[in-house]
Amino acid sequence: LVRSRGLGDVYKRQILLWRSITNWIGGMGVLVFLLAIAPVAREGGSMFLLRAEFPGPMAAKLVPRMQKSAKLLYEIYIAMTVVQIVLLLLGGIPLFDSVNISLSTVSTGGFCVRNDSMASYGAYAQNVTLVFMTLCSMSFSLFYCVLALEFLRIRRSRELRAFVVVVLGVALLMGIDTASKFTSVADGVHHTLFQVVSIISTTCYVSIDASFWSPFVWAMLTVLMITGPMSGSTGGGMKLSRVMILCKSTYRAIARTVTPNSVHLIHLDGEIVEEDTVSAVESFAVAYFMAVIFTAVVLSINGLSIGDGMLAAISSLSNVGYGIDSNTFTMGVSGLNIISKAVLCFDMFLGRLEIFPMLVLFAPETWRK
């Protein structure tokens, strides 16, 4: 689920491969995996399962039957994995490394077989990985649109535009802040783009030591940990579409204060966002930050500062993997007690299942029937 360190960085090759496979299965979602291979999938239950893993506020049916949708998603997922493996092999990367990197990149899990992550490899492997991290930060429904030649839907995607603007904007600010540290413009563009996409996709590979970046850069990257990539991607975080709806909802609240008699509707991709969806997004945001605060308090009992505790909570909830040590931005958990580790593990599951499907298990109403 999350790229974390501190439980031992040296494993046998079998363990490394198994870890990458679990990354890969979890990337698209265990529920979608089961739905894809289930012999029978009822429409009501299958739609709930698909929304649990691809819950974006505007989650739409790719094709009429949910089981067919899940199979289509996995066909795209598998194809992207195979293509990346082939490209890495063509670049001279060993087969074992290519397979593990590809499984962890397409799933945005971020596990690597080398302790210093992608910094162990050359620019070619990093650039290939950058491309696939970017693709897997996008909604898989866009890939379906490409296959169906529905390019108008892609052009109308406000979330895709926001994703491009955020990535390029943060990369530009990072480049300005660290311009004097790089030997060339090309080197600076490469590392800043790689780090921005790595964080917003919640993959969390590194192409350069994390301590290289300034506190200002890490402040921006922490915000990206929270927002995450597009809805319907394999990444974690709140998702950009939710953030966009939250911003529009806040603006509407201000507008209603100024002009209370006016009708203010929230639009996304040219469509009106239903009030139930807006309410669900607002509830998700409240639940997310309540979990961050609760985790930070628990970790403070373990001796961590509130800042480090909140960073660890955000990292776990967003399935990123950076966080506990604010000086090195690595997530070392070996020094934490069992309660703190359990809370972080719960946060990882909570974030991976988009909070509410996990909380449903603990709701009294669930067990009354």
Which ranges hold each PLM region?
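Membrane-proximal intracellular helices of multi-pass ion channels
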Residues: 2-369
